[in-house]
Amino acid sequence: MRTTFMAKANEVERKWYVVDAEGQTLGRLSTEVASILRGKHKPTFTPHVDTGDHVIIINAEKIHLTGNKLNDKIYYRHTNHPGGLKQRTALEMRTNYPVQMLELAIKGMLPKGRLGRQVSKKLNVYAGAEHPHQAQQPEVYELRG
């Protein structure tokens, strides 16, 4: 009888990828990066095991949003004090917090639980073109489309 292959966490081979966000659309970049982090691009993908690779995103400050989202899209957060609802537009987020903007988009596409928290630790986002992960010899990942 044949059995379905199940990957084991200690047998997974992980690669490092660099993705340049300059001129890329936020959602299209985020879906592909979330898929890499999860390991869905591998034939050994197992839903309950972290089979994904590490991803480094550079030039987060140069991400592109379509339509009028720079002014219309609003990011909400709460200070946990009464009346503490704060809001920022996507333009404010891109100029002041570009790393957080990308992290929020990608983490929203990952599982909500222990596996999602473990997978999100393999995401490294940098606003500029420099990153401190040269020792890992990351490969440049070309996005589809």
Swiss-Prot record:
One of its GO terms (cellular component) is cytosolic large ribosomal subunit. Transmembrane segments: none annotated. GO terms for molecular function: mRNA binding; structural constituent of ribosome. InterPro entries: Ribosomal_uL13, Ribosomal_uL13_bac-type, Ribosomal_uL13_CS, Ribosomal_uL13_sf. GO terms for biological process: negative regulation of translation; translation. This is Large ribosomal subunit protein uL13. Belongs to the universal ribosomal protein uL13 family. Part of the 50S ribosomal subunit. This protein is one of the early assembly proteins of the 50S ribosomal subunit, although it is not seen to bind rRNA by itself. It is important during the early stages of 50S assembly. It comes from Bacillus mycoides (strain KBAB4).
